[in-house]
């Protein structure tokens, strides 16, 4: 097992990474749990891992109840959030009841937002079961639900008490979900660590085969990079925005196609290539770097191009992006592979040229 600590102005917390951790969850998480816990999961994850977690909490003497939600990005909304609140209130959850998010990024984001707002703040723990959530969404305290006009538009910064990433849970992931998570892994190398990017180029077949040693190394490095960035910029006033590489274009794809039609990681993959193409238009990164990024994404089974839709729709979706400031769109681009840069775009003709093959 590998452990690292996230340090933020609000508080610090551990991330546990390894195999076979879920059966040990009671003992590992006991210092971060109250006397009672609410396990919140979905219909897909519950049959796989809920029983194991319940047994682990029983062994640690932690009482608990469970709330099981529908699965999928299409349910990341007010209606499903209210199901969490219904379950908490029906089970008389108190402010010190610990909410445990058992699932992927959708569960983690919604449970975190529920924790941030239930009785004005209850503790919560992340137990991510997808690659995307283990390397990205479970760490750093971003919580949210979607709005029909934009992804993650309603939310809060609210840090968990702990994160437990059991890599064994990745063996039950569908291949498409594994690839989607790998988009975020590749993103880290592209935005801030060319050495890691090169390592990914060399080890992608082993990673996709879930070989234990390289997988542990990759998840640890991603969490380490995110922890370092979040420690410097908890509420995304500066460099934390780098972590949104590919997301401005990607969120537009998700909103246009309908949440869940393209998986988040698939949309981010296409978005990363578009961000590199935009950087080319601005005279920053090279066509060779863009091609190299696209090739690595494709090696992970990911799309390197977005679906086709009208430029006006791209602009409409991107105008709702959370990085827009003073009406000016801000994109995360690349000076070169391994070096992200925040770019303000006032000339939409540059965006049109970037997107021209997909209009």
Swiss-Prot record:
Residues where NAD(+) binds: 71-76, 105-109, 129-130, 142, 151, 169-172
Subcellular localization(s) per the UniProt record: Cytoplasm
Cross-referenced InterPro entries: Dehydroquinate_synthase, DHQ_synth_AroB, DHQ_synth_fam, DHQS/DOIS_N, DHQS_C
Functional pathway: Metabolic intermediate biosynthesis; chorismate biosynthesis; chorismate from D-erythrose 4-phosphate and phosphoenolpyruvate: step 2/7
Transmembrane annotation, as ranges: none
Cofactor: Co(2+); Zn(2+); NAD(+)
Domain of life: Bacteria
Chemical reaction(s) catalysed: 7-phospho-2-dehydro-3-deoxy-D-arabino-heptonate = 3-dehydroquinate + phosphate
Sequence positions that bind Zn(2+): 184, 247, 264
GO CC terms of this entry: cytoplasm
Keywords from the UniProt entry: Amino-acid biosynthesis, Aromatic amino acid biosynthesis, Cobalt, Cytoplasm, Lyase, Metal-binding, NAD, Nucleotide-binding, Zinc
Cofactor note: Binds 1 divalent metal cation per subunit. Can use either Co(2+) or Zn(2+).
Main subcellular localisation: cytoplasm
GO molecular function: 3-dehydroquinate synthase activity; metal ion binding; nucleotide binding
Biological processes, Gene Ontology terms: amino acid biosynthetic process; aromatic amino acid family biosynthetic process; chorismate biosynthetic process
A Pfam family per the record: DHQS_C
E.C. no: 4.2.3.4
Gene3D superfamilies: 3.40.50.1970, Dehydroquinate synthase-like - alpha domain (1.20.1090.10)
Similarity remark: Belongs to the sugar phosphate cyclases superfamily. Dehydroquinate synthase family.
Function comment: Catalyzes the conversion of 3-deoxy-D-arabino-heptulosonate 7-phosphate (DAHP) to dehydroquinate (DHQ).
Protein name: 3-dehydroquinate synthase
Record organism: Neisseria gonorrhoeae (strain ATCC 700825 / FA 1090)
Gene this chain is encoded by: aroB
């Amino acid at each position: 097992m590998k452990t690292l600590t996230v340090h933020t102005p609000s508080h610090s917390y551990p991330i546990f990474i390894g195999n076979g951790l879920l059966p040990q969850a009671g003992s590992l998480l006991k210092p971060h749990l109250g006397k009672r816990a609410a396990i919140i999961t979905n219909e897909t994850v519950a049959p796989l891992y809920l029983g194991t977690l319940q047994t682990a909490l029983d062994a640690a003497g932690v009482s608990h109840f469970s709330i099981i939600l529908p699965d999928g990005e299409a349910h990341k909304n007010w209606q499903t959030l209210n199901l969490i609140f219904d379950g908490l209130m029906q089970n008389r959850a108190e402010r010190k009841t610990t909410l445990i998010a058992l699932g992927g990024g959708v569960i983690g984001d919604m449970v975190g937002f529920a924790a941030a707002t239930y009785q004005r703040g209850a503790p919560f723990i992340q137990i991510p079961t997808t690659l995307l959530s283990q390397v990205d969404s479970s760490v750093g305290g971003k919580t949210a639900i979607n709005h029909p006009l934009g992804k993650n538009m309603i939310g809060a910064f609210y840090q968990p008490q702990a994160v437990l990433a059991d890599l064994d849970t990745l063996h039950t992931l569908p291949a498409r979900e594994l690839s989607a998570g790998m988009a975020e892994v590749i993103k880290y190398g592209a935005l801030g660590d060319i050495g890691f990017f090169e390592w990914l180029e060399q080890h992608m077949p082993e990673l996709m085969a879930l070989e234990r040693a390289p997988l542990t190394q990759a998840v640890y490095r991603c969490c380490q990079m995110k922890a370092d960035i979040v420690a410097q910029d908890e509420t995304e006033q500066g460099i934390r925005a780098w972590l949104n590489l590919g997301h401005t274009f990607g969120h537009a794809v998700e909103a246009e196609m309908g949440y869940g039609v393209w998986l988040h990681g698939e949309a981010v993959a296409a978005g990363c290539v578009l961000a590199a193409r935009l950087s080319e238009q601005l005279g920053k990164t090279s066509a060779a770097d863009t091609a190299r990024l696209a090739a690595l994404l494709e090696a992970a089974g990911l799309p390197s191009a977005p679906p086709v839709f009208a430029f006006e729709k791209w602009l409409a979706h991107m105008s709702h992006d959370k990085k827009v400031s003073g009406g000016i769109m801000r994109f995360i681009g690349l000076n070169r592979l391994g070096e992200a840069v925040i770019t303000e775009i006032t000339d939409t003709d540059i965006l049109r040229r970037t997107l021209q093959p997909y209009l």
